[in-house]
C-alpha cells in the first residue's frame, strides 16, 4: 500500500483495496462509465485470465464486484461509448479481429474487421497441402520463401503460426484449420471520438495489425473512413469532433507518431523518435510521450518539443490528469513503486507504494469526479480519491541547474594587455577578419584534400580463400559525426553464393553502427552488389579514429571469406 505521509501534505486519500479482487490485464482494458440506469460511473475491466482461461468482463461498484460476463477471446482493449441517447451507454471490447459490443452487461452485437487479400501463392499452397498434393515440409518451404519475399507480417495468422510451430502443432494446424485460411486483422488499439457537440454520440476508432485505422459509426456499425498508414498502430488518442474538425494522434510500433486531420490524404509522421516510444497521452493541447531512455517529452500538436523530463527509473505508462475545479492539467507517470505527477514545467506530486505497480487509471468513479484506481502486480486493486483541498503551492523544477553551474564566473579585471588587444581589434578589425577567413579557407582545403586521399587509399582487402573468389570495396561518405558506409561486393565464382552476412567491426567506444550485421542472401556470379549502413562517431570531441573492418562471413565457415580494413577519417563536430 501507500507509505505513510503527512495528511496535510498528501494530495490523495489513503488507498482502499477492493474486496476479493484479483485482476490481470493491461491498462488499455480498463475504463470508467455508467452502464446501468442509476447513472453511477462504474469501473469496467476486461480480465485476461491466465493463459487464455477464465477471461471475464468484470464491473465494479464502490469496493465490490457488481457483475461479470465471459469473453470468448483474449481482450486487447476496451472502451465505454454512447451510441444511443435514449438508452444507457455501451461497452466495446476488442478481442482478436472482432469488436464485442455489450449493452446492459449483455452481449449486443459483434463487429468484425474486414479481412485483407491473401497472397495467391500462399492460398494455393494451403489448398495443395489440404488436398494431399504436397506435404508439410513443402508447405514450410513455400511459406519461408514468402516470408523472405513479402515479409512475415504480410502472411495470414495461420501461416505465421505454422512457421513458428513444431512438427506436431503443424500437423494439427493443417488438419483443423487448413480449410479455414483467412487474413483477418487483429485489433491492436481502440479509441472514441465525439460525433458533434450538439449530438454527443461517439465514433469508434480502431487500429489493426494490417496498418489500417477504421472510423466506425457506433449506431449502425458501418465503416465511415479507412486510413492506411505505414506502420502498425498501438495507441490512438482522439481530439475534437468528427462532424466539425478532428485530429487522431496515432502511436505506431516503429516509434512514430502520426497526426490525421479531416480532409488530408497524405499522412506523414510528426514525431520520429530515435528510441522506442512506450506510451502516449494527450493533455490539453500537448502530446506527452515516453521513451525507453526514461524520458518524458512534452510536444505541441505539430510535433515540436516543448520540454523534456529525465526520470530516475523506467516509466511503465502515462495517465492524463484533469481537474477542472482548479484548472489543473498534468500527467501521471507510473514507475515501479511510485507515481509522479508532472506538467510541462514542474514536478507537482509524488506518491510511493510498498508493492510494485502494474497500471493506474484516473477518472470519475461512483460520485467522485477525481478517483485514481491503482493496480498492483499481484492482482490487487486500490482506490484513492483526490483531495478537494489539495494545493500545488510547492513545485519542483525537474530540470534544475546543478549547483556547480549556478556559480558566477570570476571575470578578471581589465589589464594593460587586454586594453591593448581591444584597441588593436578596433583599429585593425577588417584586416584581422580577412586573415581569419583566409586561414579558415586554407584549413578547409587541406581537410578536403586529406579526406579525398583517405577515401581513395584507405581500404585494404584480404581474401582467405581461393575457392570463393569475392572482391570487396568500401566507400566512406560524410564529414561526421554521421558517416555513410557503402560496401560493394563482386563475385567471380562460377556458382552463386547464398546465405552470407556482412559483419562490421570497430571499437565500440568510438563508433556505433546502424546495422552492424547485414544479411547477404545471394551473390550472383559477375553481378555487383551494394550495401549501405550508417556509422556514428560517439564523441567527436576526442578527435580519435580507428580501423573499421568489414567481413563477409558464412555460418558454415570458421574464417571470413573476405575482409576489408578501412582507416576512418577524423570526425567533424555536429552542425547543431
Swiss-Prot record:
Coiled coil: none annotated. Disruption phenotype: Mutants have normal body morphology, but with reduced body length and width, delayed larval development and decreased roaming movements. Defective cilia structure and function. Signal peptide: none annotated. Expressed in ciliated cells including amphid and both inner and outer labial neurons of the head and in both phasmid neurons PHA and PHB in the tail at larval stages L1 and L2. Its main location: other. It is found in: Cell projection, Cilium; Cytoplasm, Cytoskeleton, Cilium basal body; Cytoplasm, Cytoskeleton, Cilium axoneme. Keywords: Cell projection, Cilium, Cilium biogenesis/degradation, Cytoplasm, Cytoskeleton, Protein transport, Transport. GO terms for biological process: cilium assembly; intraciliary retrograde transport; non-motile cilium assembly; protein localization to cilium; protein transport. GO terms for molecular function: patched binding; smoothened binding. One of its GO terms (cellular component) is cilium. InterPro entries: BBS1, BBS1_N, GAE_BBS1. Part of BBSome complex, that contains at least bbs-1, bbs-2, bbs-4, bbs-5, osm-12, bbs-8/ttc-8 and bbs-9. Interacts with bbs-7 and bbs-9. Component of the BBSome complex. The BBSome complex is thought to function as a coat complex required for sorting of specific membrane proteins to the primary cilia. The BBSome complex is required for ciliogenesis but is dispensable for centriolar satellite function. Required for proper BBSome complex assembly and its ciliary localization. Required for cilia biogenesis and both the assembly and movement of intraflagellar transport proteins along the ciliary axoneme. This is BBSome complex member BBS1. The lineage of its organism: Eukaryota, Metazoa, Ecdysozoa, Nematoda, Chromadorea. The gene is bbs-1.
Amino acid at each position: 500500500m501507500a507509505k505513510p505521509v503527512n495528511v496535510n501534505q498528501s494530495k490523495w486519500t489513503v488507498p482502499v483495496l477492493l474486496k476479493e479482487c484479483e485482476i490481470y490485464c493491461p491498462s488499455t482494458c480498463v475504463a470508467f462509465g455508467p452502464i446501468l440506469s442509476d447513472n453511477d460511473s462504474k469501473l469496467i475491466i476486461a480480465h485476461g485470465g491466465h493463459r487464455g482461461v477464465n477471461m471475464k468482463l468484470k464491473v465494479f461498484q464502490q469496493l465490490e464486484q457488481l457483475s461479470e460476463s465471459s469473453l470468448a477471446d483474449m481482450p486487447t482493449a476496451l472502451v465505454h461509448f454512447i451510441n444511443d441517447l435514449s438508452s444507457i451507454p455501451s461497452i466495446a471490447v476488442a478481442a482478436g479481429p472482432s469488436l464485442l459490443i455489450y449493452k446492459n452487461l449483455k452481449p449486443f452485437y459483434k463487429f468484425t474487421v474486414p479481412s485483407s487479400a491473401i497472397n495467391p501463392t500462399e492460398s494455393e499452397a494451403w489448398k495443395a497441402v489440404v488436398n494431399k498434393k504436397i506435404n508439410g515440409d513443402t508447405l514450410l518451404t513455400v511459406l519461408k520463401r514468402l516470408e523472405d519475399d513479402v515479409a512475415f507480417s504480410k502472411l495470414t495468422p495461420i501461416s505465421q503460426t505454422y512457421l513458428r510451430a513444431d512438427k506436431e502443432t503443424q500437423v494439427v494446424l493443417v488438419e483443423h484449420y487448413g480449410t479455414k485460411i483467412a487474413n483477418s486483422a487483429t485489433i491492436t488499439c481502440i479509441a472514441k471520438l465525439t460525433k458533434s457537440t450538439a449530438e454527443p454520440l461517439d465514433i469508434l476508432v480502431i487500429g489493426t495489425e494490417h496498418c489500417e485505422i477504421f472510423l466506425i459509426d457506433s449506431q449502425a456499425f458501418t465503416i465511415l473512413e479507412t486510413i492506411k498508414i505505414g506502420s502498425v498502430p498501438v495507441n490512438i488518442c482522439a481530439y475534437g469532433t468528427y462532424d466539425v474538425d478532428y485530429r487522431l494522434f496515432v502511436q505506431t510500433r516503429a516509434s512514430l507518431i502520426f497526426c490525421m486531420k479531416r480532409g488530408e490524404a497524405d499522412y506523414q509522421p510528426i514525431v520520429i523518435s530515435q528510441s522506442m516510444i512506450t506510451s502516449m497521452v494527450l493533455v490539453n493541447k500537448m502530446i506527452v510521450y515516453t521513451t525507453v531512455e526514461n524520458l518524458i517529452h512534452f510536444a505541441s500538436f505539430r510535433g515540436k518539443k516543448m520540454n523534456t523530463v529525465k526520470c530516475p527509473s523506467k516509466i511503465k505508462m502515462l495517465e492524463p490528469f484533469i481537474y477542472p475545479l482548479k484548472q489543473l492539467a498534468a500527467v501521471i507517470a507510473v514507475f515501479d513503486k511510485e507515481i509522479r505527477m508532472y506538467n510541462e514545467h514542474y514536478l507537482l506530486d509524488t506518491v510511493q507504494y510498498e508493492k510494485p505497480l502494474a497500471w493506474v487509471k484516473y477518472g470519475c468513479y461512483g460520485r467522485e469526479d477525481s478517483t485514481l484506481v491503482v493496480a498492483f502486480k499481484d492482482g490487487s486493486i486500490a482506490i484513492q480519491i483526490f483531495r478537494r483541498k489539495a494545493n500545488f503551492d510547492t513545485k519542483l523544477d525537474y530540470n534544475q541547474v546543478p549547483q556547480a553551474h549556478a556559480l558566477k564566473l570570476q571575470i578578471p579585471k581589465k589589464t594593460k594587455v587586454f586594453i591593448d588587444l581591444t584597441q588593436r581589434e578596433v583599429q585593425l578589425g577588417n584586416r584581422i577578419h580577412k586573415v581569419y577567413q583566409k586561414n579558415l579557407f586554407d584549413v578547409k582545403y587541406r581537410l578536403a584534400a586529406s579526406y579525398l586521399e583517405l577515401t581513395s587509399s584507405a581500404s585494404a582487402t584480404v581474401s582467405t580463400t581461393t575457392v570463393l573468389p569475392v572482391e570487396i570495396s568500401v566507400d566512406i561518405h560524410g564529414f561526421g559525426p554521421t558517416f555513410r558506409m557503402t560496401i560493394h561486393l563482386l563475385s567471380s565464382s562460377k556458382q552463386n553464393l547464398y546465405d552470407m552476412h556482412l559483419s562490421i567491426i570497430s571499437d565500440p567506444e568510438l563508433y556505433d553502427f546502424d546495422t552492424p550485421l547485414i544479411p547477404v542472401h545471394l551473390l550472383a556470379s559477375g553481378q555487383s552488389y551494394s550495401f549501405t549502413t550508417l556509422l556514428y562517431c560517439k564523441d567527436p570531441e576526442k578527435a580519435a579514429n580507428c580501423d573499421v573492418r568489414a567481413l563477409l562471413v558464412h555460418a558454415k565457415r570458421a574464417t571470413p571469406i573476405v575482409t576489408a580494413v578501412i582507416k576512418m577519417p577524423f570526425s567533424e563536430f555536429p552542425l547543431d
